[in-house]
């Protein structure tokens, strides 16, 4: 089981103390950690796996699989939401959850800035003393997920690899948009929350034009989400609004461009979450994303 120090509700259990002087840790039931030492990237990554209720009791059943970026934060959150909203299969279809963890030895910011961004940033600063800032390895990371993470998950868990979902927020949403425009059939569904489309002078919007110039279809189901405060305050008095990046406008522009091509196998929806900003929107966005991608059968 995966151990966390969290103040969250069931399905967490309290493990037996390892020593009399140490308080017990909080663990997430039915979870595992797999470590991949990537030869291609030269780094180690933890892959967090959460199994649905009844997984062991139904050996003939295969499950859809949700991959979520920023696992350190997103995995326990999605796990808890799936437990509560899923309501034993009545609210959501049961699924296997795979959390994509950060590289060992990196801070979360260093790892995600490198792995989730599609190009370098000349103005970047490093949050790791003695290490230069590093951005722009989203394509290498995408290949790592496809060639190393996918085989591990398929070989060890009863998943339906024809029902893969990718969910990401902020830089994770930027990475999801990169995958969508690079290899759209890598996943069947995409939950893209508050993507950092502003990155590198909106490089993803340029990639969208390049994709459209050489393709006549984009076969994927896509949910785009953003908070209503992720735009600029027209009177500049409300601190809940963004100060410089109009992420709501960028998302609308991305949506309109995708729709304009009338791709025959693209299904796209957009949800603006009222009353939420960039840091508060994800719990609601992923809840709606689960309901959209995995409705109860």
Where are these regions (language model features)?
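Non-catalytic cap/lid and distal C-terminal segments of serine-dependent acyl enzymes
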Residues: 16-297
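Bacterial N-terminal signal peptides
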Residues: 1-11
């Amino acid at each position: 089981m995966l151990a966390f120090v969290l103040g969250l509700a069931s399905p967490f259990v309290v493990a037996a103390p390892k020593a009399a002087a140490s308080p017990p840790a909080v663990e997430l039931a039915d979870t595992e950690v797999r470590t991949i030492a990537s030869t291609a990237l030269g780094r180690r990554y933890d892959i967090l796996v959460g199994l649905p209720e009844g997984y062991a009791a139904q050996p003939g059943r295969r499950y859809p699989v949700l991959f979520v970026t920023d696992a350190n934060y997103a995995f326990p959150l999605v796990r808890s939401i799936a437990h509560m909203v899923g309501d034993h299969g009545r609210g959501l279809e049961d699924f296997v959850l795979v959390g994509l963890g950060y590289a060992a030895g990196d801070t979360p910011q260093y790892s995600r800035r490198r792995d989730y961004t599609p190009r370098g940033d000349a103005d970047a600063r490093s949050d790791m003393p003695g290490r230069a800032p590093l951005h722009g390895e989203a394509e290498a990371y995408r290949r790592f997920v496809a060639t190393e993470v996918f085989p591990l998950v398929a070989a060890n868990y009863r998943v339906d690899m024809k029902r893969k979902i990718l969910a990401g927020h902020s830089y994770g949403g930027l990475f999801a948009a990169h995958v969508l425009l690079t290899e759209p059939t890598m996943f069947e569904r995409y939950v893209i929350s508050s993507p950092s489309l502003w990155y590198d002078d909106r490089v993803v919007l340029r990639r969208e034009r390049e994709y459209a110039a050489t393709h006549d279809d984009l076969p994927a189901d896509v949910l785009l989400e953003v908070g209503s405060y992720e735009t600029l305050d027209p009177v500049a008095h409300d601190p809940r609004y963004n100060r410089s990046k109009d992420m709501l406008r960028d998302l609308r522009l991305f949506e309109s461009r995708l729709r304009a091509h009338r791709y025959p196998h693209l299904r796209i929806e957009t949800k603006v979450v009222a009353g939420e900003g960039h840091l508060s929107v994800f719990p609601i966005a992923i809840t709606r994303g689960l309901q959209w991608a995995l409705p109860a059968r």
